[in-house]
Curated annotation (Swiss-Prot):
Its EC number is 6.1.1.12. GO terms for molecular function: aspartate-tRNA ligase activity; ATP binding; catalytic activity, acting on a protein; nucleic acid binding; transferase activity. ATP binds at residues 221-223, 230, 483, 535-538. Residues 199-202 are annotated as: Aspartate. One of its GO terms (cellular component) is cytoplasm. Belongs to the class-II aminoacyl-tRNA synthetase family. Type 1 subfamily. It comes from Lysinibacillus sphaericus (strain C3-41). The keyword DNA repair does not apply. Catalyzes the attachment of L-aspartate to tRNA(Asp) in a two-step reaction: L-aspartate is first activated by ATP to form Asp-AMP and then transferred to the acceptor end of tRNA(Asp). This is Aspartate--tRNA ligase. It holds the Pfam family GAD.
Length: 589
């Protein structure tokens, strides 16, 4: 085989008359009455190669090649005639006149066409993932992913950060999701866990005095999957010592600006918008709001207190909430049947109903309009900024149901009404989170983020009297309605960390067994430290305009956490189980 001289994207009319050697895959072959044309594909693009009967040996071989054959061609770059120019490809003004053809390898007929547009099932694509990855759109996504990680590394190293790898085989600790467990052959009956995050190790690196750490970290969580979750994923993990929260946010803003400029050619203004957790929930019904469009939630308790509409008045009297969204100018777009469908939709999120009113020239119109006297209607219209042609939708329930149902409805309406500018990247910090979440079902508190998050110093006394009122020095970075990542200032005193464990239901013995190494480390001069981690897979998904996390992971798992290509997970031999002192309980498939 000859040495390849050029890739497809390196060919242009400036090379007219030059001899080149190209290698790649046959995308398409066409026989046009003597002349044979082959579209040769490599990872950079497609080049048209023409075979003339005058070059008999190469022409005869070209007649036999089929799609996805791997070939090598030698030939001369020539200009296409004016009527043959293809404006849809970068090198569409030239073609290569072949003088030699070598078939490096043949190929079976592929189970689907290797083209960007394919309507085959995702399962078939995942089974033949190595073929799916040949599609240019997939290569472009992974080229972008590589560019993102390169930019991140360069930025952080220039900022003085050290890239440090932390263990993959580690100790099982309660961090929220279930651990993936790895049995130890050497220590019978004992297990390692795959890390859900490098959280404890990166804090210990701050104890060690490293001050600035980062890692492109592999993480594992055995949890129920959805479109934007995978059992194994990659996060950009960062930890620093001696920085304030504002300094951490500012540094990460500059990191994101660098990525957006390098990878997308977009200048993102900073500082990013900041919004406290409670404000986000009040205005958007979500802790990760998409702020590219309006449709904000409006609180109406004061409007409906003691009003003639008993459903709303009773809700207010019970200490619950009534909120509304004004769908501007949508009265003509939603029929009664459409509103019934929206009512079913909010029911998924616990709402018992969706009340609605249309604003007409004659006043309010809809199923509940008869309960609104002139004064109440005027007060509502003023509060909602309503005009003729608007629809007002209402949910009345406890705060969590109102937020969940109207927050989800807001997102649906934004999509259905085409209100979202898909070209926009709206970054947002959500700050001042609650430190704890209380589970009525379990009758206990859980950490809203993780057990190592630092409370506001002025809220520490509330840990003994009103834990639900304690605010966390935590921050999430949100992009276009997706939680991109999050971080916090950390606890760095042993007594405060022990108090945190106590409130989370750990006995002193349990805390020592699970986290004794961390508690002891906190007795050896620990600096204040803070950090952040964001999901690389999700970041690339959003930058690439993809809608599925699996499209940004080379060999992903399905929604059932299986690999259709390798058929993992799979059974192992009795001998392997015996070595690990394991036995499988009988079960039904």
């Amino acid at each position: 085989m000859a040495t390849r001289t050029h890739a497809s994207n390196e060919l242009s009319e400036t090379l007219q008359g030059e001899k080149v050697v190209l290698k790649g895959w046959v995308q398409r072959r066409r026989d046009l009455g003597g002349l044979i044309f082959i579209d040769l594909r490599d990872r950079t693009g497609i080049t048209q190669v023409v075979f003339s009967p005058d070059v008999a040996e190469a022409h005869a071989l070209a007649d036999k090649v089929r799609s996805e054959y791997v070939i090598e061609i030698e030939g001369t770059v020539i200009l296409r005639t004016e009527d043959q120019i293809n404006p849809n490809v970068p090198n569409g003004k030239i073609e290569v006149e072949a003088t030699r053809l070598v078939v490096i390898n043949t190929a079976k007929t592929t189970p689907f066409q290797i083209e960007d547009r394919t309507d085959v099932s995702e399962d078939l694509r995942l089974k033949y993932r190595y073929l799916d990855l040949r599609r240019p759109v997939m290569f472009d996504t992974f080229k972008m992913r590589s560019d993102v990680t390169r930019t991140i590394r360069n930025f952080l190293q220039n900022e003085g950060f050290l890239e440090v790898e932390t263990p993959i085989l580690t100790k099982s600790t309660p961090e929220g999701a279930r651990d993936y467990l790895v049995p130890s052959r050497v220590h019978e009956g004992e297990f390692y866990a795959l890390p859900q995050s490098p959280q404890l190790f990166k804090q210990l690196l701050m104890v060690a005095g490293f001050e600035k750490y980062f890692q492109i970290a592999r993480c594992f969580r055995d949890e129920d999957l959805r479109a934007d979750r995978q059992p194994e994923f990659t996060q950009v993990d960062i930890e620093t010592s001696f920085l304030t929260q504002e300094e951490v946010l500012e540094m990460n803003e500059r990191l994101i600006q660098a990525v957006m400029k390098e990878v997308k050619g977009i200048d993102i203004p900073a500082p990013f918008q900041r919004m406290k957790y409670q404000e986000a929930m009040d205005r958007y019904g979500s802790d990760k709001p998409d702020v590219r469009f309006g449709l904000e939630l409006v609180a109406l308790n004061d409007v409906f207190e003691g009003c003639g509409f008993k459903v709303f008045a009773d809700t207010v009297a019970q200490g619950k909430q009534v909120k509304s969204i004004n769908i501007k100018g949508a009265a003509d777009k939603y029929s009664r049947k459409d509103m019934d469908e929206l009512t079913k939709f909010v029911g998924i999120y616990g709402a018992k109903g969706l009340a609605w009113l249309k604003v007409t020239e004659e006043g309010l119109n809809g199923p509940i309009a008869k309960f609104f006297d002139e004064a109440l209607a005027a007060a509502l219209i003023e509060r909602m900024g309503a005009e003729v042609g608007d629809i007002l939708v209402f949910v009345a329930d406890k705060a969590s149901v109102v937020a969940a149902s109207l927050g989800a409805l807001r997102t649906k309406l934004g999509q259905d009404l085409d209100l979202i500018d898909e070209s926009q990247f709206a970054f947002l910090w959500i700050t001042d989170w609650p430190l704890f979440e209380y589970s009525e079902e379990d009758g206990r508190y859980y950490a809203a983020h993780h057990p190592f998050t630092r409370p506001f110093d002025e809220d520490i006394p509330l840990m003994d009297t009103d834990p639900s009122a304690v605010r966390a020095q935590a921050y999430d970075i949100v992009l276009n309605g997706y939680e991109l990542g999050g971080g916090s200032l950390r606890i760095y005193e042993r007594d405060l960390q022990e108090k945190m464990f106590e409130l989370l239901g750990f006995s002193e013995e349990e805390a020592q067994a699970q986290f004794g190494f961390l508690l002891e480390a906190f007795e050896y001069g620990v600096p204040p430290h803070a950090g952040l981690a964001f999901g690389l897979d999700r970041f690339v998904m959003l930058l690439a305009g993809r809608h599925n996390l699996r499209d940004t992971i080379a060999f992903p798992k399905t929604a059932s956490a299986s690999c259709l290509m390798t058929e993992a997970p799979s059974e192992v031999s009795p001998e392997q189980l015996s070595e690990l002192s394991l036995a499988i309980k009988p079960f039904r498939k």
